[in-house]
């Protein structure tokens, strides 16, 4: 297996390409994960950047392109939104107002644009966004088909730590796996990948291309991705941002609480680590920690059946009479309105 990195024009991102030997009886899919930074508080500029990266990936033949967690809208790394137990600051509330303003409605014009881009470049697009639903924000993944159609979304079920201050909780109605000509595609976001029951639900839906947009650049993340590939007998595509301090607004507009005084504009605040892993646990491309990059591998879909010959976690290796899972896949709304229709009889009859 040869790893080839090809510089792009204008010193842009690198495209790490893996040429795999392929079984001629099984289809091969070229997958790309994007490792790049949001343009914080500037959603139109971030969408423009997404288009440039998508066009570049498509020029190399990518059929599915996965962007990082919260790429549209931004991951507010280092911010505490002025929160301490029993207290919220005026600046923190203003920070939330700006963050809310940078989020997108689903459906909405930004979703329409992303769908059009997927169709223009003929790729399946998996995009991390901050979704605005009224005044609640969700960390969400959007799915788009290569024909230019919005397919659906997954809302992060469990935000981690202080994320719970700014993001709502998804429910069981948005755990989709989409059957497409290039395989069954699903996604889990960042640390919800550590939730065994969520993974099991996705395996039960037959996920073959398991997308894992994340904000975790630690080396230990690689162990989680390898485990999921082996456990699920699926390809794992994990995309993370690569960010320096200069990719965020300068202080005092934006402050990395507790570390700002130690940072320079060139300080790396998120080191990437984007990776593509096969169902056998082999690393096909990445992890990359050196800067913005497009990371690609050719996925031999025959690897899925070969992996599941030994271990099919919700098939021949399951014991449903001993261990089983119930998933509540209906929406959970805080308010339900019901209307009773009253039949008015014509008393003249």
Swiss-Prot record:
GO terms for molecular function: 3-cyanoalanine hydratase activity; cyanoalanine nitrilase activity; nitrile hydratase activity. Ubiquitous. InterPro entries: C-N_Hydrolase, C-N_Hydrolase_sf, Nitrilase/CN_hydratase_CS, Nitrilases_CHs. It catalyses: L-asparagine = 3-cyano-L-alanine + H2O; 3-cyano-L-alanine + 2 H2O = L-aspartate + NH4(+). CDD domains: nitrilases_CHs (cd07564). The active site is at residues 69, 156, 190. Transmembrane segments: none annotated. Its EC number is 3.5.5.4, 4.2.1.65. Residues 29-301 form the CN hydrolase domain. One of its GO terms (biological process) is detoxification of nitrogen compound. Involved in the cyanide detoxification pathway. Has nitrilase and nitrile-hydratase activity in the ratio 4.0:1, producing both asparagine and aspartic acid from beta-cyano-L-alanine (Ala(CN)). Can also use 3-phenylpropionitrile as substrate, but not indole-3-acetonitrile. Belongs to the carbon-nitrogen hydrolase superfamily. Nitrilase family. This is Bifunctional nitrilase/nitrile hydratase NIT4A. The lineage of its organism: Eukaryota, Viridiplantae, Streptophyta, Embryophyta, Tracheophyta.
